[in-house]
Amino acid sequence: MNEVVIPSVLQDGSVRTPEPRKQNLLDLDREGLERFFADTLGEARYRAHQVMKWIHHRYVTDFDQMTDLGKALRAKLHQHAEVLVPNVVFDKPSADGTHKWLLAMGTDGKNAIETVYIPDKGRGTLCVSSQVGCGLNCSFCSTATQGFNRNLTTAEIIGQVWVAARHLGNVPHQQRRLTNVVMMGMGEPLMNFDNVVRAMSVMRDDLGYGLASKRVTLSTSGLVPMIDRLSTESDVSLAVSLHAANDALRESLVPLNKKYPIAELMESCARYLRGSKKRDSVTFEYTLMKGINDQPEHARQLARLMRQFDNAVQSKDAGKVNLIPFNPFPGTRYERSGETEIRAFQKILLDAQVLTMVRRTRGDDIDAACGQLKGQVMDRTRRQAEFRRTLEGQADRDAAA
């Protein structure tokens, strides 16, 4: 990957050629790193493997500390490469052991995301973001109130895992405190497909974090064509933000349903399972909101949908349900369902032989619970105003020219 470097003319008439931008090695999976070492550095493939382990196993970002690399190779790395990880703005522990990091992406202060670690009975799950903000406008999600800013790079996605694993003292293949990763943070992962898939490759690589495919879960609101593409490029676990089992209600909660209604979504999920013997189920997430989608009829609709899905895949428990009590945030019109309603909803599903779990709320005292992540993204009105000012400034400069 050769970058074109464009010279600039200075006021005194001299020409200055800027230095080529260095390659952030955190942006590369194993294949990309091998290619970079061969094409740019002229080095053997095993050298790329050594560096990958230094970065992801030992959390070393200074080439001079990579002691099994020769001096000449370290010099070439300094010239052509760097390892840039997200900056930790703050980290905040919860009373229940949950831990949240606010990570700065870039230098303008407007691009920050949140990453959450949830320990629970011998496992540790990291909730990772894929975008700064989100553009899908799900009406019950805090992130949606901030609008969409941009996609995260591969380095910014896997960098969240790096920051958390380093903080936790995680040692891949030995001392595992980070056992699962869920792409359920800020953003819609399938709208940042290439960067997310590349980052998940590092998560699952033995030279990276060594997680089994079933321990990496991608959660989507239902981009049908991208689910089909994911089926051909990755074997991770799939979760779907369903939240309603009829189109009219789901459209009011998840506007994407207008483009990809439930029938199309369920068909794509069935294709995903049929695409590999390694995949045996899809998790359907259902956030329970008081008086909105928590009534017995809603539970019966969901039970029917899960039975239809099992029949389509020809496998029992192909569809699993994860009930999520709604987590309130400032300005929302929704309320959490009561414990009685939650248990009654679950009982209807269990009686219909639908495998159903209720997700215990974690980290709500630090706004780290499901649906509460929003980072420090400029709100949409301010961002649109800034964009208009930028356009006006450009127009003034064009007129002056």
UniProtKB/Swiss-Prot annotation:
CDD domains, alphabetized = Radical_SAM
Q: Which reaction does it catalyse?
A: adenosine(2503) in 23S rRNA + 2 reduced [2Fe-2S]-[ferredoxin] + 2 S-adenosyl-L-methionine = 2-methyladenosine(2503) in 23S rRNA + 5'-deoxyadenosine + L-methionine + 2 oxidized [2Fe-2S]-[ferredoxin] + S-adenosyl-L-homocysteine; adenosine(37) in tRNA + 2 reduced [2Fe-2S]-[ferredoxin] + 2 S-adenosyl-L-methionine = 2-methyladenosine(37) in tRNA + 5'-deoxyadenosine + L-methionine + 2 oxidized [2Fe-2S]-[ferredoxin] + S-adenosyl-L-homocysteine
Residue positions of the active site: 114 (proton acceptor), 370 (s-methylcysteine intermediate)
Task: Tell me the name of the encoding gene.
Answer: rlmN
Q: What else is known?
A: Reaction proceeds by a ping-pong mechanism involving intermediate methylation of a conserved cysteine residue.
The cysteines joined by S-S bonds are 127-370
Q: Where on this chain does [4Fe-4S] cluster bind?
A: 134, 138, 141
Localization terms from the record? Cytoplasm
Put simply, this protein is called: Dual-specificity RNA methyltransferase RlmN
Q: Which GO terms describe its molecular function?
A: 4 iron, 4 sulfur cluster binding; metal ion binding; rRNA (adenine(2503)-C2-)-methyltransferase activity; rRNA binding; tRNA (adenine(37)-C2)-methyltransferase activity; tRNA binding
State the needed cofactors, names only. Answer: [4Fe-4S] cluster
